[in-house]
Amino acid sequence: MKNILLSLIIFYRYALSPFMGNHCRYYPSCSVYTQEAIQRYGGFRGGWLGLRRLLRCHPFCPGGIDQVPEIAKWRSKS
């Protein structure tokens, strides 16, 4: 699953993104963020972090620098 998701992100970045323009309000871009999250945490957790990031990336969001969090910062407390 991890490799399939990473392949889709790479396809998006090189085949679709050049035609859509650079509109991401965050650094790193949403595709780079999601790719790093999936590589670090796997398909499910990394995909969830990427989806949350995509939902935050809209015209009314101020954006800024948003790195992939360390696991201790976003894991639920027990």
UniProtKB/Swiss-Prot annotation:
Disulfide bonds: none
Membrane topology, from the record: Peripheral membrane protein
A single Gene Ontology CC term: plasma membrane
Family according to the record: Belongs to the UPF0161 family.
Keyword Cell membrane part of the UniProt annotation: yes
Function: Could be involved in insertion of integral membrane proteins into the membrane.
Subcellular location: Cell inner membrane
Originating organism: Nitrosococcus oceani (strain ATCC 19707 / BCRC 17464 / JCM 30415 / NCIMB 11848 / C-107)
Domain of life of the native organism: Bacteria
Designated name of the protein: Putative membrane protein insertion efficiency factor
Alphabetical list of InterPro entries matching this protein: Membr_insert_effic_factor_YidD (IPR002696)
Pfam families per UniProt: YidD (PF01809)
Keywords: Cell inner membrane, Cell membrane, Membrane
